[in-house]
C-alpha cells in the first residue's frame, strides 16, 4: 500500500502533468485561432518552440534510456566475468 508521502508525490506529478498538458494544448491548438495582437500571446513562447521543446525532450529521454541500458548491460557483463 502506498504511504502518505507516495500519494502526495503522485498527486504532485499528476498535477504537474495536467498543467503542462493544458498549457501545451492551449499553446499549440487554441493560440493560432486567437488574434496575434491579443494580450494572451505574451504568456506563450513563439510557435517555433512548440516543436523544438518536445523534440529536445524526446531526444534527452532516448539518450537517458540508452545510457541506462548500456550501464545495465555493462554491469551485468562485468558481474558475469567475475563469477567465472
Swiss-Prot record:
Task: Report a single Gene Ontology molecular function.
Answer: enzyme regulator activity
Q: What is its main location?
A: endoplasmic reticulum
Q: Which domain of life is it from?
A: Eukaryota
Please cite one Gene Ontology biological process associated with this protein.
GPI anchor biosynthetic process
GO cellular component term of the entry, any: dolichol-phosphate-mannose synthase complex
- Which key words are in the record? Endoplasmic reticulum, Membrane, Transmembrane, Transmembrane helix
Pathway per the UniProt entry: Protein modification; protein glycosylation
**Residue intervals passing through the bilayer:** 11-31, 49-69
Localization per Swiss-Prot or TrEMBL: Endoplasmic reticulum membrane
Describe its membrane topology: Multi-pass membrane protein
Entry keyword annotation includes RNA-binding:
no
One Pfam annotation reads DPM2
Q: Does the record's keyword annotation contain RNA-binding? A: no
State whether it acts alone or in a complex, and with which partners, per the record: Component of the dolichol-phosphate mannose (DPM) synthase complex composed of DPM1, DPM2 and DPM3; in the complex interacts directly with DPM3. Component of the glycosylphosphatidylinositol-N-acetylglucosaminyltransferase (GPI-GnT) complex composed at least by PIGA, PIGC, PIGH, PIGP, PIGQ, PIGY and DPM2. Interacts with PIGA, PIGC and PIGQ.
Function statement: Regulates the biosynthesis of dolichol phosphate-mannose. Regulatory subunit of the dolichol-phosphate mannose (DPM) synthase complex; essential for the ER localization and stable expression of DPM1. Part of the glycosylphosphatidylinositol-N-acetylglucosaminyltransferase (GPI-GnT) complex that catalyzes the transfer of N-acetylglucosamine from UDP-N-acetylglucosamine to phosphatidylinositol and participates in the first step of GPI biosynthesis. May act by regulating the GPI-GNT complex.
Question: What is stated as this protein's family in its record?
Answer: Belongs to the DPM2 family.
Q: What is this protein called?
A: Dolichol phosphate-mannose biosynthesis regulatory protein
What is the species listed in this Swiss-Prot or TrEMBL entry? Bos taurus (Bovine)
Amino acid at each position: 500500500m502506498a504511504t502518505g508521502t507516495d500519494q502526495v508525490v503522485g498527486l504532485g506529478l499528476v498535477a504537474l502533468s495536467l498543467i503542462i498538458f493544458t498549457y501545451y494544448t492551449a499553446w499549440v491548438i487554441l493560440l493560432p485561432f486567437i488574434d496575434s495582437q491579443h494580450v494572451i500571446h505574451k504568456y506563450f513562447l513563439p510557435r517555433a518552440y512548440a516543436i523544438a521543446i518536445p523534440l529536445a525532450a524526446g531526444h534527452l529521454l532516448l539518450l537517458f534510456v540508452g545510457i541506462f541500458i548500456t550501464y545495465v548491460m555493462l554491469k551485468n557483463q562485468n558481474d558475469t566475468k567475475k563469477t567465472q
